[in-house]
Amino acid sequence: MSNTVVCALYRFVSLENYQEIQAPLLKMMQANNIKGTLLLAQEGINGTVAGSREDINTLIAWLKSDPRLNKLTTKESFTEENPFYRTKVKLKKEIVTMGVEGIDPKRTAGSYVKPKDWNALISDPDVLLVDTRNDYEISIGTFKNAVDPKTTNFREFPQYVKDNLDPAVNKKVAMFCTGGIRCEKSTAYLKEQGFDEVYHLEGGVLKYLEEVPQEESMWQGECFVFDNRVSVNHKLEKGQYDQCHGCRLPITEDDKKSDKYQEGVCCHQCHEQLTVEQKQRFAQREKQVGLAKQRGQTHIGNDAVAQLENNRLKKQAVKQAQRVEAKK
């Protein structure tokens, strides 16, 4: 049974003292062995973390003890192993980066649509369905009839809207993303640009996969996630994709058969873009990861830091014992 809870969370709310929250939040996560990354900004909090059921409950309770975060949006899935190596709390200008000043989802945003009502909305021929995620995310799964903006990052989305959408033509626009947070900003942006009927999938794709039976689903493929699982299927279980360590893009078992694929180094998508030095560095890293696994250790992440410190202390103890023995 999968016993690690993966929890995606966010909340757009004014956090004037967000910088002061960083240290106690990080300490709290470390004390409860929670891994993952949370972003703090004046506009709110966002991130994905993983840990035991008890520890995740403790974290959520801690966050919601702040009245500003008591309506925190959370979505959960489950996995065998923790998909994160490190524990981080970062300070940011935005909790999801669009790069447009003045966009405030707290003030204006699109209409939320529950997962159970989503199929009916996107089946309306008058509705333009837009996937707000990046091209590499869309490549492994999306909703039937969704438009792919072909953006490589969320900063490119406003330009896509300016070049391709028109309030006079696109009377009804529905948008979706992985967990809902990007759509908070994308729908707010469209409203600011004069679009009237703007909708977005409440809770994102992850909530849809959780609540809509697979036999009724209009989702096609798998859903990309930003952790070591790479993708999840309709049951929210780890999907069939792995990740290239050279370019961080999803790859299939067939992709690994390419003569341009080298485990831990590169794939057919980045083989020509990486320098010789980069490939050598990645190959050395992969070698160290393999050696660490043979020793039953971790090469990267918080555990690796602890192991290095433990090894250092052991060496000190050995040297001290040798000095004591030499004096006899």
UniProtKB/Swiss-Prot annotation:
Belongs to the TrhO family. Catalyzes oxygen-dependent 5-hydroxyuridine (ho5U) modification at position 34 in tRNAs. Keywords: Oxidoreductase, tRNA processing. Residues 123-217 form the Rhodanese domain. It comes from the Bacteria. The active site is at residue 177. The lineage of its organism: Bacteria, Pseudomonadati, Pseudomonadota, Gammaproteobacteria, Alteromonadales. This is tRNA uridine(34) hydroxylase. It catalyses: uridine(34) in tRNA + AH2 + O2 = 5-hydroxyuridine(34) in tRNA + A + H2O. GO terms for molecular function: oxidoreductase activity, acting on paired donors, with incorporation or reduction of molecular oxygen. SMART domains: RHOD (SM00450). GO terms for biological process: tRNA modification. Its EC number is 1.14.-.-.
